[in-house]
Every structure is written in structure tokens, then in C-alpha cells.
Regions:
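N-terminal, polar/charged subdomain of small-to-medium soluble alpha/beta proteins
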Residues: 1-154
């Protein structure tokens, strides 16, 4: 019994029975540097700019409860490829919009409990190394709704 989720991971249909929700592990993607059409200004719509994407995901720990095969785990490889696919679809006006798309794709996997996402534009101001935002999202265990908290960073 296997089902497919859109992040490209194969998930056993009985996985929920095997997950210990009190235990988690982290998946980290640090400073994924990609070129993107992002921004509201004309020059940002005409030329790609470098962005940095960093993610920290708290995932239900199923490490000891199931067979150690990649298809049984949240795959950072699939997440990276899905982020690249989002950027290939075309121009995005705001980092906040890109952030929500990345959050949504990560939460498609029911094992992901929290997401901390940092998005930075690396070439906006010569006086800074970057400007950007951080987004934190947490699934509420009672009804699987997502609590939202958005903050900006320099």
C-alpha cells in the first residue's frame, strides 16, 4: 500500500500508525542559491537575480518505526527539485508569495509539523549582503490547521 504526494515522495498508506508524534527530527536545506525572476520593479522583471533559500523542517520521527528506505522519509532532494520547479514557472512579485508556495508544498507531506523558511535577495542593495523575510509555520495538532507568523529580516 503506497500513495503518492506531490513532493514526489512515496508514502506508505499505513504510515500514520507507525509515526510517533512526540518525536521529531529536522530536515535542513541551507542557502540554496538560485536565480529567479522575483520582485515588483521593472528591472527585477527583466533580469533574474540571485536568491538564497534556507529551510528547517520539523518532521514526525518515523526513523525507528519503519524500514530505512528513502521512500519512507521526507526527501530534501524532492523539496529542492520542487522549489526549482516553482521558480521555472515564471515571475513572482514578492518573496512572501514565493514563501507561501514553498510552505504549501512542504505541508503537502503530512509528516512535516513545522517550517522555518528564510528567503533572501542577494543583489538588491550594494550596501547589504542580503534583504529578505523569514516565515514560520506550525501545524496545529488538534485540527491540522496551520498557525501563521510572518516576520521581515534585513
Amino acid at each position: 500500500n503506497i500513495s503518492v504526494i506531490s513532493t514526489g515522495s512515496w508514502v506508505p498508506t499505513d504510515l500514520n500508525k507507525k509515526i510517533k508524534s512526540e518525536n521529531t527530527y529536522k530536515i535542513l536545506i541551507n542557502q540554496l542559491i538560485l536565480d529567479a525572476f522575483i520582485g515588483i520593479h521593472d528591472f527585477e522583471k527583466k533580469k533574474k537575480q540571485k536568491i538564497s533559500i534556507s529551510l528547517s523542517l520539523d518532521v514526525n520521527d518515523n526513523i525507528s518505526g519503519i524500514e530505512h528506505k528513502i521512500e519512507n522519509f521526507v526527501s530534501y532532494e524532492h523539496i529542492v527539485e520542487d522549489i526549482k520547479s516553482i521558480l521555472k514557472k515564471g515571475h513572482i512579485d514578492l518573496l512572501e508569495t514565493l514563501g507561501e508556495k514553498i510552505v504549501d508544498l512542504c505541508f503537502e507531506d503530512e509528516r512535516v509539523m513545522t517550517i522555518k523558511l528564510k528567503l533572501e535577495k542577494l543583489e538588491v542593495f550594494k550596501e547589504t549582503s542580503s534583504v529578505g523575510i523569514e516565515i514560520f509555520r506550525k501545524k496545529n495538532s488538534r485540527n491540522d490547521s496551520i498557525e501563521k507568523n510572518l516576520s521581515t529580516t534585513d
